């Protein structure tokens, strides 16, 4: 019988399960590993999810990962290769009682890396969307308890829309962060000039940085459009 699809309430131990596995993965991948990220629904606090920890290691060179297959197998993982996504190495642990998935990407593959990070961070920052997505998954799990294709197909359109919103939101957050950083630098320069002019460096810096933060925030919040008018 196929593996049963279950969506359960959030479990605090998911974070510690990730951290425990993170140490093992870093030890296996060694210096090739740049970072290991907890992704998927189990990485979003208070969000119901399938009780499978999704882990995304990022490496310098993906071609070196296959040489570690025996080490991953020793930890209980099945090595599945790309498993439908070019540029990925996928590992599954737990058999029919699945507990972990590992999705390894090379650092040059920012498209896949950023879409995973963007969705995670968007759901963490938008609890209403997280609740909506969880409700959809619970509905699909009840409708397709032993049909993984039916479950995945049922949320495909929602996930596409979610990824698009998450990536736009992430881009805006990045612009805002850049704008604020530039504003602080610009404000500090203005503040120094004010301080020298009025013989009060502290006051000048406060005024300058405040002005810089204001303009930096406005700059970072501006919508960007391309030549076709698309954001």
Predicted regions and their residues:
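Short, flexible turn/loop "capping" segments at secondary-structure junctions
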Residues: 1, 46-50, 113-114
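Helical scaffold of the NTase/Pol beta-like nucleotidyltransferase catalytic core
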Residues: 1-37, 160
